[in-house]
Amino acid sequence: GTTFRTSIAENALVGSYAVVNNKGCMVHPKTPAQDMDEIASLLQVPVVAGTINRGNAAIGSGLVVNDWAAFCGLNTTATEITVVERIFQLRRDLGGGRANLLQQLRDTLVDELA
């Protein structure tokens, strides 16, 4: 496998200052644009700088995300949630309302657990 050594906003603990899924990446708000471009190029996903939990720069301490859901701290603001939903592409028009959403979630879980 390939190993990439990097830092995020001059912090070596990249797991605390970045959260990534296969759709996007969110990093420490003081990450230089050049570093964000390098990360985007390495991972082949869009990268955005931001905070979580009402201004916390340690993104990894307050956000867990996968391909279809994100869990964040209770103090996370609406603006922060909007950024999370957009960069990780979590809001999709599923059509058919709540019943269809629940069915799709059930189908996904059953597929993964089968």
UniProtKB/Swiss-Prot annotation:
Pfam families linked to this entry: eIF-6
Keywords, alphabetical: Cytoplasm, Initiation factor, Nucleus, Protein biosynthesis, Ribosome biogenesis
GO molecular function, one term: translation initiation factor activity
The keyword Transcription is annotated on this UniProt entry: no
Source superkingdom: Eukaryota
SUPFAM superfamilies in UniProt: Pentein (SSF55909)
Chief localisation class: cytoplasm
One Gene Ontology term from the biological process aspect of the record: cytosolic ribosome assembly
Task performed by this protein: Binds to the 60S ribosomal subunit and prevents its association with the 40S ribosomal subunit to form the 80S initiation complex in the cytoplasm. May also be involved in ribosome biogenesis.
Family: Belongs to the eIF-6 family.
PANTHER family, per the entry: TRANSLATION INITIATION FACTOR 6
The protein's assembly and partners: Monomer. Associates with the 60S ribosomal subunit.
Protein name from the UniProt record: Eukaryotic translation initiation factor 6
Organism from which the protein derives: Trypanosoma cruzi
Organism lineage: Eukaryota, Discoba, Euglenozoa, Kinetoplastea, Metakinetoplastina
